[in-house]
Amino acid sequence: VIYIFAR
């Protein structure tokens, strides 16, 4: 779920 924070 790191992708969500990378947005």
UniProtKB/Swiss-Prot annotation:
Its EC number is 3.1.1.74. It is an enzyme of class 3 (hydrolase). Its main location: secreted. Induction: By contact with cutin. Keywords: Hydrolase, Secreted, Serine esterase, Virulence. The keyword Iron does not apply. Belongs to the cutinase family. This is Cutinase 1. It comes from Colletotrichum kahawae.
